[in-house]
Amino acid sequence: MATALCPLRALGQTAFRPRTRRLHLSAPRADAVVISGRKLARQIRQEARHEVEQWVAAGNKRPHLSVVLVGENPASHSYVLNKTKAAADVGISSETILKPASITEEELLDLISKLNNDANVDGLLVQLPLPEHIDERKICNAVTPDKDVDGFHVINVGRMCLDQYSMLPATPWGVWEIIKRTGIPTLGKNVVVAGRSKNVGMPIAMLLHTDGRHERPGGDATVTISHRYTPKEQLKQHTIRADIVVAAAGIPNLITADMIKEGAAVIDVGITRVQDPITAKSRLVGDVDFEGVKKKASYITPVPGGVGPMTVAMLMKNTIIAAKKLLKPKALEALTA
């Protein structure tokens, strides 16, 4: 009889255990603990590096990540560079395939098909956003699900919503790991997720509200989702009662100190480039008024240096999952046996 393997551990996805879940969170603090996403990401990348070393030492092929980058968007080029640097850091080989913004949708689909069928490619992602003439949803669904390290394919999204094993989207998984590794309890807690995007807000809500005893980790929280049509005063009515607020709307200063109760944990996923009124230089800001909110919150993530580094780290973990083919049908059967 085969030795039982913890399925969540095999996927690198772990859940809170009931004995570690605390029911207290909102005790007043003088100032928030600023969670360093960079520090947590270094820890995860170290784990990934060790996992790759063990995998290769066992005689397996080194994991390989292919990134398709379309156009000349400076932010996209910067993000892709960060991803390939992280891959090199953990021992994953990678390539960036550059294509002009004039590429047709058919040509891009043909390229993805070739990469899907390339046995040397373990993980595959197409950097978003894409030019307006290309259907992003069609492109995301063209990537084969077990190579879909972004976790955007409809099959991976569907499996995640059904609490089944799937390739988790990197940013939501990064938010989950921040909460879990920081020790912020979620069992029975009130959570507000500001933002309902299919790649960020919705998956974060799914991870936080589902049953922690199921295949895929869940936080057992009571989750409220707001969006662009939620009036600010109505949003405040929800956030003022929330133990955890996750801001993922892409609206600078959406969450202010008067909207947060004492001792709440605040995770800022938003990232917007604005011009500093004093220096006239551009800088990155989140959705949260950091200076004001940190005086009331118990935990808070900064922008930059919070969720961003975690997104890249979780992408590396997904590439390893893809290389080990843990989401192939036969592997899934073994995990659930």
From Swiss-Prot:
Entry annotated with the keyword tRNA-binding: no
Subcellular location, principal: mitochondrion
Cofactor: Mg(2+)
CDD domains per the UniProt record, alphabetical: NAD_bind_m-THF_DH_Cyclohyd
Catalysed reactions listed for this entry: (6R)-5,10-methylene-5,6,7,8-tetrahydrofolate + NAD(+) = (6R)-5,10-methenyltetrahydrofolate + NADH; (6R)-5,10-methenyltetrahydrofolate + H2O = (6R)-10-formyltetrahydrofolate + H(+)
Entry-linked SUPFAM superfamilies: Aminoacid dehydrogenase-like, N-terminal domain, NAD(P)-binding Rossmann-fold domains
Compartments where located: Mitochondrion
Pfam families, per database record: THF_DHG_CYH (PF00763), THF_DHG_CYH_C (PF02882)
Annotated EC: 1.5.1.15, 3.5.4.9
Any one of the GO CC terms: mitochondrion
UniProt name for this protein: Bifunctional methylenetetrahydrofolate dehydrogenase/cyclohydrolase, mitochondrial
Organism encoding this protein: Gallus gallus (Chicken)
